[in-house]
């Protein structure tokens, strides 16, 4: 339970919420979320967005939500965090071990392939294009 929140679906966006939505968009591509929509996002009084209902993830495909973010500059904080994570073998190993306790090996391997592919795109270019996102289909 997250107190003092409401459904985000009908709220207008601002700079702070748009940055968060871009990060959620990338996260959803990496975990292959097939059910992200405004109805499973909630927002608090400080404009902090929470992605809820993540049950349809790590599946055979992802939903192509938030198409307006293709080719837009992604937040510097996301680029920095992805760069740091991908440069840290120990952190990746720990995450892999934890995921292996919860998911089949093939899904964990696909997750890391998507993470590395998307992460490198973002680090190198700061954006993801629609064509590049279509490449994710080969990582499932």
Summary of predicted features, one role per range:
Residues 1-140:
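Phosphate/dinucleotide-binding and metal-coordinating scaffold of catalytic cores
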């Amino acid at each position: 339970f997250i107190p003092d929140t409401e459904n985000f679906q009908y709220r207008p966006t601002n700079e702070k919420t748009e940055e968060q939505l871009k990060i959620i968009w990338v996260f959803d591509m990496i975990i292959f979320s097939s059910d992200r929509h405004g109805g499973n996002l909630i927002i608090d009084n400080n404009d902090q967005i929470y992605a809820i209902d993540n049950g349809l993830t790590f599946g055979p495909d992802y939903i192509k939500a938030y198409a307006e973010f293709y080719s837009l500059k992604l937040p510097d904080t996301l680029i920095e965090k992805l760069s740091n994570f991908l440069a840290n073998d120990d952190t990746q190993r720990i995450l892999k071990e934890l995921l292996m306790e919860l998911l089949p090996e093939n899904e964990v391997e696909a997750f890391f392939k998507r993470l590395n592919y998307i992460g490198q795109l973002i680090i190198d270019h700061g954006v993801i294009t629609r064509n590049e996102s279509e490449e994710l289909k080969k990582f499932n």
